[in-house]
């Protein structure tokens, strides 16, 4: 019974050790660049909402 706290502490330490397969994301990584590109595309689409509704009737149905 006295080894239980030691076992729990060891499990917590093992879980907190970073593994070799984990890689930090930088601004040059493709997933992050894709994320920012998608955000810009969505913001551009939302800002063009008025123009879309003026020129295309079907577009207003989505808004």
From Swiss-Prot:
GO terms for MF: toxin activity
Cellular compartments annotated: Secreted
Tissue specificity annotation: Expressed by the venom duct.
Stored InterPro entries: T-conotoxin
GO cellular component terms listed in the entry, alphabetical order: extracellular region
Signal peptide positions (record): 1-21
Name used for this protein in its record: Conotoxin Gm5.1
Gene source species: Conus gloriamaris
